[in-house]
């Protein structure tokens, strides 16, 4: 068998893979003499970094104990038989150690520690490997730190002080309008509707509670005109936020109250000239005459 020809195909595994190229079960116990000579010849030429010169290869009688990869920078535990010469890159470097590149042993991905150390040195200076060592890129800081927040505080305080508006000066008290006796309203406490047996009173039994403003406006209108036309009644209802029926009933009740006071006083007010006596009754809500004291807007036909 031509071992020299076979070794031409095995020169890369023997020189580059090192001791971990073969497992403990599949590695041969010894090399033929011709294969050892081939390895020696390749190492002496310096074509590959995996062999020693022939004197160093002949002096050593076996490999050092092989070790399994446990962590980066830790040698492999022993798993291969002895009887092999140690592999080195060159006579100037001494015995070499190989480490896996994050792959299984069968993949054959190994590198030399000396080259890896040089690369790490360059990375630590250039990029700050592992966060240690100064580099051209300084460590990043949070965008909003305590110093920035402290610097923003005076600006925010100034903005807040500008946003605060000065209180408006109190307006001078306007003189109250003159109040006549007929404008004064005597309020009675509202009577609650009686609760029926079914639990609620009938809607017709509920009284409308007028506000003071509504009563004042109704009294003013009654003082000038005791009878309202339908157009005027609708206008007053819209102004006071009432309905037409409420205004009509209030004027009817107010006329009845006025007549009761006149009867109790023993004096009958004279009827307006030109107005028949029947028109002053309570049977109708309209009047065919015009009162001399009525306002121009309350003139009825």
Curated annotation (Swiss-Prot):
InterPro entries: HD, HD_metazoa, Homeobox_CS, Homeodomain-like_sf, HXA1/B1/D1
DNA-binding region: 203-262
Cellular-component GO terms for this entry: nucleus
Bias-annotated ranges (Polar residues): 26-38, 55-70, 284-301
Region (Disordered): 20-77, 127-149, 255-301
Domain of life: Eukaryota
Subcellular location field: Nucleus
Short motif Antp-type hexapeptide, span: 179-184
Keyword annotations: Developmental protein, DNA-binding, Homeobox, Nucleus, Transcription, Transcription regulation
Primary site of residence: nucleus
SUPFAM superfamilies: Homeodomain-like (SSF46689)
Keyword Translocase appears in the UniProt entry: no
Signal peptide span: none
Biological function: Sequence-specific transcription factor which is part of a developmental regulatory system that provides cells with specific positional identities on the anterior-posterior axis. Acts on the anterior body structures.
Name this polypeptide is given: Homeobox protein Hox-B1
Name of the gene: HOXB1
